[in-house]
Amino acid sequence: MVITLANDELTVQFKQLGGALSSIKDKDGVEYLWQGDANYWSGQAPVLFPICGSLRNDTAHYALKDGQEASGVIPRHGLVRKKEFELVEQTDTSV
């Protein structure tokens, strides 16, 4: 789903899949974000969090405050680019 915010100057759109800002248009309809081109890449501009790229065996290792070590799986390019974001609140100026 795409969420839209608009005022007299700008219209912005966000995709719930990946939580990405997907469009910024001015009042004349001029687009300021790259809209993607399937000839080069199937995507647009995903949110890559907390990493860009991949980890060895898709595994992050980290130290806990108590000195213990832990690990967890983080897929290539992070956790959020293919996740559906839930709209919790929308106002005239924020989502």
Regions found by a protein language model. Give the residues of each.
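Surface-exposed acidic/polar loop and edge beta-strand patches at domain peripheries
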Residues: M1-V95
